[in-house]
């Protein structure tokens, strides 16, 4: 059995764009003319390891949606958490600021984001980066990981296909432990605020936050109603929160 599907563009890294097209298994170019054997779990619903997943924001669908084509996107993941779960408000990026993260194939994404801790950047990024960086325990496909891989030239290796398996077996890839630590600093609850070791701990902590719960319900209301809430909607919001707690 082939563990990995064939991809039409071998020169590309595996990103969200590759989810849009995977070469069909029955094409002659795939060399799969015999009976296919699948190793998907037969028990449904599948129970994910509790040390790897904790709710919707650790689901591969959300993680892939908030990824770049070829890498994670901790900044926009952090913005999502800050605005929708902590009811935070961010200003626009100043027009004279270069918002691009430096490119360096010899460094992990988190290492490349270190310049954002400079004083002129950190006054805003301190609100979002510590909330987005815990998701580094997953790759841009939402797969759980504990290490980053580097090739013999010291460049980060993003592919996860048959070639990856071969290089790993031959000992041609080195590893560097993932740093998924972060911090909750604006929940309004001292019991929730503080350092977190990864996204699972962060989600469990936010799950106990009154502010996160009420902010989530408020944004859910806006999504379904297509407008902001008004004073006259207070009863609806109170009932929505009661239903949330009861379930």
Tell what function each PLM region has.
Residues 225-229:
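Axial heme c-ligation environment in periplasmic c-type cytochrome domains
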